[in-house]
Amino acid sequence: AALALSKVYTFGPTFRAENSNTTRHLAEFWMIEPEISFADIKDDIDLGEDFLKYLINYALTTCKEDLQFLNDRAIKEESQLPKEKRNELSLLERMEMVVSHDFERITYTQAIEILLQSKPHKKKKFKYDVSWGVDLQSEHEKYLVEKHFKKPVVIVDYPASIKAFYMRQNDDGKTVAAMDILFPGIGEIVG
């Protein structure tokens, strides 16, 4: 934390230097970066989950008309899609589900094991390979949150080789204390 302050944060614009011409990454976005003294990865996860639930609860209580409009619009748009492409829950139902349930917490190794046992992997439906030490692709994240768990998922303890050099190394010497929070319909929202 900053100058002996135990809990601080910054909120400001972030710009991507790499090519961001995708539907998954923004070239510019606003980011909150909390810094907490004497905290571990569990504290980081708890903060991320609590913060996201707070934001969603706030929107549900103060923006009811706007959310109802978006919900109705999404239902109308999805009615044009094939059934297998439609969400099982409406926007409002998904938001209520997020705030009323704990996020699933798994390790990267557990995520790989789940993916290796999945029907899409066994039927060779994934475009990208699933193996330990390879970064998860959006199709893998989507399967975990939308098909397997059907709720937000926190993945921890990634291989050191796929995360930033400054991440704290775990006792096993192979993984680091890093986490991502994945949301249905979005993908990585914290990480």
Q: Which residue stretches match the model-derived regions?
A:
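Flexible, glycine/charged-enriched surface loops at secondary-structure junctions
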Residues: T61-N71
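A translation/RNA-centric and nucleic-acid-associated enzymatic feature enriched
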Residues: A1-N57, D72-G191
